[in-house]
Amino acid sequence: MNIVDKFKEKILSGELISKKEAMILSKENIDELASAANDIRMSLCGKEFNLCTIINGKSGRCGENCKYCAQSVYFKTDIEEYNLLDSESIITSAISNYNNGVHRFSVVTSGKKITNKEVHTVCKTYSELKDKCDIKLCASHGLLNYEELVKLKESGVIRYHNNLETSRNFFSNICTTHTFDEKTHTIKNALKAGLQVCSGGIIGLGETMEDRIDMAFTLRELNVDSIPINILNPIKGTALENQEKLSYDEITKTFALFRFILPKKQIRLAGGRALLNDKGERLMKSGVNAAISGDMLTTSGIKTFDDIKMIKELGFEV
């Protein structure tokens, strides 16, 4: 039995691998890792594939300095800027996505956090939406406090999104206007408020494979439910506009390792899919069991109809 199969069997027997073991796996053959990750997904998660969509509920003018982000005031980009969308626009989008076969819908807003007034506004929208549509509600409104997160829960939100973005060690290389600890504090408060949590990051920022593995282990310690992994799509005008893109092999290895580290969780293919020549099909054979469909915040995505067709052809149930 080779090393990949040895660790696969360890996971299938109910144990978890250590960081040292994950680092060993990171040096192994990509195809073997991907195949084993797919076996783990099939054995522990089954054929269910979770599909979500997002709407950019408030765009641009963000005071944070995340180097990858087109919405930051620190960078000159061509993105559209607007205040919080009206409830009718959000509700119409959610119902449309639900009718297209999407399971989850999230309103994502720019900025470190939304204001108290905006919390009240979105909660009212979520309450209205809950009465009109059965789609599961997610929210991504920045570094909210416990009381604000409780209000979201009471208005019908099931899952809160707050990405770690990268490892604790690498975080200050991409952002200095807020901290890694502020993010983990928000995640812990969301869990305390009774919300599920969606948290992952971006790969291709200049981090090492060890950074990605460290992030995965932090997410495991936090016990988040869904792990969205974005592939950096360098945007002109941002600090990372000339960042070298990762190879598909490197991307595949990363996704497979996340399945080894987080065997029972939703490993979600997120932004950057448009960079992949197969729309992420290879990754869906390498441990992925969830995806964000449709357009991302500031970049184009994959149409939901095309996603569902591909996902079903791969043997998943949507």
Swiss-Prot record:
Keywords: 2Fe-2S, 4Fe-4S, Biotin biosynthesis, Iron, Iron-sulfur, Metal-binding, S-adenosyl-L-methionine, Transferase
Pathway linked to the protein: Cofactor biosynthesis; biotin biosynthesis; biotin from 7,8-diaminononanoate: step 2/2
Family, as annotated: Belongs to the radical SAM superfamily. Biotin synthase family.
Function: Catalyzes the conversion of dethiobiotin (DTB) to biotin by the insertion of a sulfur atom into dethiobiotin via a radical-based mechanism.
Phylogenetic lineage: Bacteria, Bacillati, Bacillota, Clostridia, Eubacteriales
PROSITE patterns in UniProt: RADICAL_SAM (PS51918)
Protein name listed in UniProt: Biotin synthase
Originating gene: bioB
Keyword Cell membrane appears in the UniProt entry: no
Textual note on the cofactor: Binds 1 [4Fe-4S] cluster. The cluster is coordinated with 3 cysteines and an exchangeable S-adenosyl-L-methionine.
Cofactor: [4Fe-4S] cluster; [2Fe-2S] cluster
CDD domains hit by this protein: Radical_SAM
Leader sequence segment: none
An annotated Gene Ontology molecular function: 2 iron, 2 sulfur cluster binding
GO biological process terms held by the UniProt record: biotin biosynthetic process
EC number(s) per entry: 2.8.1.6
Annotated ranges, domain Radical SAM core: 44-273
Enzyme class: transferase
Keyword Lyase among UniProt keywords: no
Amino-acid positions noted as binding [2Fe-2S] cluster in the UniProt annotation, renumbered to this chain: 106, 138, 198, 268
Reactions that this protein is recorded to catalyse: (4R,5S)-dethiobiotin + (sulfur carrier)-SH + 2 reduced [2Fe-2S]-[ferredoxin] + 2 S-adenosyl-L-methionine = (sulfur carrier)-H + biotin + 2 5'-deoxyadenosine + 2 L-methionine + 2 oxidized [2Fe-2S]-[ferredoxin]
Binding positions ([4Fe-4S] cluster): 62, 66, 69
Organism from which the protein derives: Clostridium botulinum (strain Eklund 17B / Type B)
